[in-house]
Amino acid sequence: LRSGHLQTWITGLYRPVAQLPTPRIHRIPIGEYGAMLIHENVPESLASDAPSVLLLHGLGSSHAGTYMTNIASGLLARGCRVFRADLPGAGPSSQTTHLPPHGACFDLVRICLNTLSHTQGIRSWRAAGISLGGNVLLKMLARHAIDPTKYPFDFEVDYALSVAPPIDMKECCENVERGIKRLYTHYFIRILKMQARQQASIWPQWREVLRNADYRTIRRFDETITAPLAGFPSADAYYQFGSSIDDLKNIDVPTTILIDEHDPIVPAHIFDRAVFSATTRLVRTQHGGHVGYLHRLPISDGKAGGRWQRWADNTIAAELAKPNWSQRSG
């Protein structure tokens, strides 16, 4: 598939979820906001030096999403200990915090990692973030590097991988309001509207903001729902605080950012404005769309011939599971 739109659309329809063992659920307190949920799976035989990997999902997804489960499956097969986060308000975390799913929750993710590092005896982490989760990961790494006193890490990060991160959140919201890309706005708004109604059935804070809810665009949704619930005075303030584009030059751990030149949601040109640190590698692909990367296996591949394969899921798992990342980052 050579069209970024086709890659993105088909990925939205082709959702094979990997079957994983029942996870252990960690309920992590996040102060006055309640708790976040982290879902842990371990391989059948866990080595003492097995890498611990955190996975962060994108907007409208959760720990149970297609790429989250498929990447986790690949990591487990490679002997890794896997932790899939539900960002605040996403998936089952909607039951434990009134916060909305949002792209400025990097400090809450840091708190979760600190807690897990202490309770589980984990000294070092590898992490991957997909789409909005990728921006959250980059922002967390950068803010720690800028101000380790305010944003302390009680752990080391051996390696980070960010896929299709909306590093300029305002620009990405404006981008999906142009032309045919409005279809993506309709897709996200449909999911967000459904989530909002579910949240309002649980939390009075949601019932209050929904009185003035505006669902016409993602920006209007963020202005009337996300920003006030997340503690920001406006969508612009939320985007400014959450976007990682101005902080990327400060990241001091080995980091790969994977983007596609034909991503219809996160435009590649925003990365031309970014300044990257010496430890960051930007990888540009062609025709992958927004976290798509689908291709058909040749008919000659036996029973699998002609089937779609999700290239990125396996590639991300293989990259995160590489040996000796700790030595490379030291």
Predicted regions and their residues:
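N-terminal cap/lid segment of alpha/beta-hydrolase-fold proteins
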Residues: 4-45, 302
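Short beta-strand element of the alpha/beta-hydrolase
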Residues: 49-58
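Conserved alpha/beta-hydrolase
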Residues: 61-64, 72-96
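Catalytic nucleophile-loop/oxyanion-hole region of alpha/beta-hydrolase
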Residues: 74, 88-126
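Active-site nucleophile elbow and catalytic-triad environment of alpha/beta-hydrolase enzymes
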Residues: 224-247, 253
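Short beta-strand/loop motif that positions the catalytic acidic residue
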Residues: 251, 257-259, 263
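Catalytic histidine-centered segment of alpha/beta-hydrolase-like enzymes
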Residues: 288-310
